[in-house]
Amino acid sequence: ISTVAKALKQSGINSLLLSIDAFHREHISLDKVYLFAKAVSDECISGFKLHPAWVVKREEHNKYNEETEECLNYFVDLQIPITQGNNIFPSGNAAIYLSEFYEKKPINLSMKCGEAPYTERLDNVETIAINPNGDVVVCCFIIGNIYCDNIIDIVGQYNPCTNPMIGALINGGVRELIKLAEEYEITVDTTQFYSACDVCRNIVKRLSLRIT
């Protein structure tokens, strides 16, 4: 653990958010996370903060938020700053396992990437994610793999205009993506989803098998 913390310090990293919440505790014991947090804190890495995730919002009273508060208290002696955290929205597993906490509302299908929380325009990307298998991801689109190509090349070669799904989202939002899916005989029942993002991810997953 100390070796990893020192490596992070040497890399020049200037922002590090450590997920602390009820959901991560199900898979990783707080004792182990505490040791990592202390090691990073001892290295004085700038921008190191604890980053919780809240069901609906922090002020909402439910068992998951109560457990997350308990998790944060576990680290109180380290005096690590805490971010406001993320408000979980019902998409993916959250829509399956946390549906009781959310109400289905009419979905704005004209919504474009960058208008929903935690999203950005696909033609003005500032954030990427790298999955454990090396996939480089922009939102839910895989644009390369670091085990196959250099990350600089992957980012430099990203062109949203070459992907018809991205083009549809940029031009007309989720509604345009649905039209594209229908051209490939893919039907979408939007009443089964909680958000435009959830509709989008479902279509992209299914449509990618037809287009690529």
Residue positions per predicted region:
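Alpha-helix boundary/capping residues
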Residues: V40, F75-L78, Q157-C161
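Radical SAM/AdoMet-radical enzyme domain recognition
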Residues: I1-F75
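Accessory C-terminal segments flanking Radical SAM cores
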Residues: G85-L209
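Flexible glycine/acidic-rich beta-alpha junction loops that bind and position SAM and/or redox cofactors
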Residues: E26-I28, W54-L109, I143-N145
